[in-house]
Regions:
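Conserved acidic residues
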Residues: 70, 243, 266
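Active-site-adjacent mobile loop/cap segments within catalytic or ligand-binding domains
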Residues: 4, 12-15, 22, 74-81, ...
Length: 281
């Protein structure tokens, strides 16, 4: 299972009028890294839309970065205008607009319905959470109908066939919510809760393997860690060359090893595969 996380905005963006030290972009960046770490504990492969907090990527391109993934998440906090508003304090999760009743529509909506109340409870917001979609007036998918998703990141995800969500973690125009989001311990709670909901939704269980400090490997990777992987596979009797290049033969050996050990045979070496290779299951 592969998830793409987007930290909404970049640099120093969307300063809070309620707590001037808060920038939405800072919170999004911290939270997306924490969520990545928590999801990986369940065996998810997690990619992000960019590696540098200070570099931007177009909205549609961010959604399209989820190509080949099972889920796209864009993390945010919301705002009511540009001034303080203490009355509006709720969590909103936007799912794909249901314009054609596809499976990705249904999955994004179903997960949104699971996430919204949990995030709301963890954050202790004033008002009930909202699960919604928003229709725009564009024709991104080229079907001739001007009814696609209003949000470009979700359009990008839809165009590559990925269920997508925008998660608005209440409002940075509200003082209490903003201060809550500035606490790193609270962000850790959020990441754990969101990862738990997502893992349950996809039927993933938290791995009980130790932290090995080993990178996830896949076809195309090279280097000493790939060479070590190949040596381990050779030791188990799989036929491949120990050359430090993760090519088709190495991928085939990994997939065969995974099948023989009742693991997901995806030819990606993550925590569970490393643990099995090293006899730590």
């Amino acid at each position: 299972m592969r998830i793409c996380i987007d930290a909404g905005h970049y640099g120093k963006y969307n300063r809070s009028p309620a707590v001037p030290e808060y920038y939405e972009s800072d919170m999004n960046w911290k939270l997306h890294l924490l969520l990545k770490k928590e999801l990986e504990k369940y065996g998810f492969e997690v990619v992000t839309t960019r590696a540098d907090k200070n570099k931007d990527l177009g909205l549609n391109a961010r959604g399209k970065a989820s190509k080949g993934c099972d889920l796209f998440l864009s993390l945010h906090s919301n705002a009511v205008g540009s001034s303080v508003n203490e009355d509006v304090d709720y969590v909103a999760v936007y799912h794909l607009y249901e314009d054609d009743g596809t499976d990705i529509d249904e999955r994004s909506k179903a997960l949104a319905q699971k996430l919204a109340p949990v995030i709301s409870r963890v954050m202790g917001v004033k008002q009930a959470p909202k699960v919604c979609s928003r229709r725009g007036s564009g024709d991104w998918n080229g079907d001739g109908v001007l009814n696609d998703n209003y949000y470009s990141v979700l359009n990008g995800a839809r165009l590559v066939g990925t269920p997508g969500l925008i998660i608005e973690h209440s409002f940075h125009t509200q003082t209490r919510a903003t201060k809550w989001l500035m606490d790193d311990q609270n962000l850790e709670k959020l990441a754990k809760a969101e990862a738990e909901v997502i893992a349950e939704f996809y039927g993933m269980k938290q791995t009980k393997t130790p932290e090995l400090g080993l990178p996830m490997l896949r076809q195309g990777d090279t280097g000493g860690t790939v060479r070590a992987l190949q040596a381990l596979l050779r030791g188990y009797g799989y036929s491949l060359t120990v050359d430090g290049i993760f090519g088709p033969k190495t991928a085939n050996a990994v997939e065969c090893f995974q099948e023989d050990n009742d693991l997901d045979a995806d030819a990606i070496v993550g925590p569970l595969t490393w643990a099995a290779l090293m006899g730590l299951e």
